[in-house]
Amino acid sequence: MSSSLSDRSALVLDLGARYVRCGISGERAPRCVERWQVGDMLQKPLSAAEWRQYLYPKLHALCFDLLLVNPTRRRFVVCEDLLLPRVFRETLLNILFDVLKASAVTVVPSMMAVLYATTNHTALVVDCGWAETRLLPVFKGIPLPYLYETVSVGSRNCCEVIKRELNVYRDQPMDGSKLVTPITETMAEDILERACFAQQKDPLPNVVDAEFQTQDMQVSGNLRTAAVEQLLSGDDGTDGTSIVDGIIHVLKKAPLDIRAAMLENLLLVGGTAMIPGLAQRVVAEVREALRHDNEFASASDAVGRAQLVQTYFPRNMLAWVGGSIYAATDSARVSAISSQEYSSSKGTSIPDWLTVAEEEF
């Protein structure tokens, strides 16, 4: 009985830039969410040895210390970004097969996995992450990778604003004898998660300040909303591009006959999308921008129907939940790479996603 259960349940990994989520297939939430530094490490080229030195302790701790399962002869389902470096993917597979002794591994794009956690097969998936926002249209279950787009704006931009503004005040304490700890990136992220939100088109007139007793600091009502505006205005190191700009750019590149379907099925996912009010504000900004765009003048009805895909799980967990559901399907087993196939191909059995798309479509 236990061997049958082990064969059915897979270990599901959702690899984000800031966090990795891990759990057992068929469950509704990951068992552990751990911070890691992959997003920062991707800013410069790394060798396979450097990736192995970082990834092996992380994966070992996830399986043995946090999940408390033996990964030997277990299936893995890995939800990853479309454009992760090949050396990262090869090193990851090498650790899973040669060190953790996985029986099979299924690699699925996280922006496709999210649809398994919804009732939709069509959506413009907007993955709002730590360092960037990624956009991928999916029409009737078929991804359109030639429309894939990235925007250099994410939670990190918001945290930089919070750090800069708060450190200006903390550098000049009222009590000169009192040492004040400068705001770190981790503290700024905590403030963003707990105190910040996106104003709507009709903004609240008076936003109260937020006090953090543990750090002896006060976040002004203006900063609570101004930090999030970086995602919508494209200032402060984002090359003048915002999430709304990215969505409109993808819509303009998309074929005419799918634009309405994309507008009616906007799916915002990722940790940054958890900021209260952000998803609703993005849709409102998209509607407003397209109403003044001559290219969409003949599609005013579709612009008015722009709306979010209804979600049944937290937006930052959708990729993992989708991977958990997908892992229980026959498709996951059919597309899996077994340890025998991996060994016989000497680790070359994982092509790039864009190569797969080119061959199939």
Question: Residue locations for each model-derived region?
Answer:
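Conserved phosphate-binding catalytic cores of ATP/NTP-utilizing and phosphoryl-transfer enzymes
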Residues: 1-5, 102-126
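Conserved phosphate-binding loops in N-terminal lobes of ATP-dependent enzymes
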Residues: 2-95, 104, 145-147, 166, ...
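A short acidic Gly-Thr/Ser loop motif
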Residues: 5, 13-19, 118-120, 125-134, ...
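Phosphate/ATP-binding catalytic cores across multiple sugar-kinase/actin-like superfamilies
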Residues: 58-66, 224-261, 281
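Glycine-rich phosphate-binding loops at beta-strand->alpha-helix junctions
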Residues: 80-89, 196, 200, 264-285, ...
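Phosphate-binding glycine-rich/basic clefts of nucleotide- and phosphate-handling proteins
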Residues: 139, 143-240, 244, 262-265
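Structured C-terminal portions of repeat-based eukaryotic scaffold domains
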Residues: 251-268, 272-307
